[in-house]
Amino acid sequence: MLPQGLIVSCQALPDEPLHSSFIMSKMALAAYEGGAVGIRANSKADIIEIKKEVDLPVIGIVKRDYAHSDVFITATSKEIDELIESNCEVIALDATKQTRPKESLSELVSYIRNKAPNVEIMADISTLEEAKNADELGFDYVGTTLRGYTSYTKGHILYENNYQFLKDVLAHVNAKVIAEGNVITPEMFKDVTDLGVHCTVVGGAITRPKEITKRFINAFDK
């Protein structure tokens, strides 16, 4: 089980300056030394390097684009196989209602349970309906990761209306809830923790210096 507290997402995509499994492993080490209780990471290669560097549970994902589908976070059994080989403790996958490229969500849950019964599963959702569905499918964790990132939730952010969406998810699912997405300040981390989430994933605000720099620069463009 993931411990309660702060999980730091250490990811860099191919077009980003820090794209390197070695660099991500050092980013994870810095997060560990700062007090993180877990890491979220993208790709088998990154996870293997991170696990050499820190003794923390890892939420693993594989981001891969597929034609005719907007699902790109651990979209098929191919990505799940890679994550099982990485020995990550938790596999996270897109649990939205978007059209999937191959297997159904329920088929993927069964696939993980059968192939890796000791691995926990996290649902990345964007709506309350998706959270409830993930809960019914038996996910161990439900995360608000994709709120604002699906076509039908675009424009929404986690902290709008005093975190009402997060409050609704907490009230309607039995799975442990993970706050993720647009948690960009220590105060927000405290806010969502006080609401009762099991843990919180923070990425861009900690591990993406290019984006952090842009936020400072953009302050002058408004």
Curated annotation (Swiss-Prot):
EC number of this enzyme: 5.1.3.9
Gene Ontology cellular component annotations, sorted alphabetically: cytosol
UniProt cross-references to Gene3D superfamilies, sorted A to Z: Aldolase class I (3.20.20.70)
Pathway: Amino-sugar metabolism; N-acetylneuraminate degradation; D-fructose 6-phosphate from N-acetylneuraminate: step 3/5
Catalytic reaction list: an N-acyl-D-glucosamine 6-phosphate = an N-acyl-D-mannosamine 6-phosphate
BP GO terms, sorted: carbohydrate metabolic process; N-acetylmannosamine catabolic process; N-acetylneuraminate catabolic process
Family: Belongs to the NanE family.
Record-given protein name: Putative N-acetylmannosamine-6-phosphate 2-epimerase
Organism: Staphylococcus saprophyticus subsp. saprophyticus (strain ATCC 15305 / DSM 20229 / NCIMB 8711 / NCTC 7292 / S-41)
Lineage: Bacteria, Bacillati, Bacillota, Bacilli, Bacillales
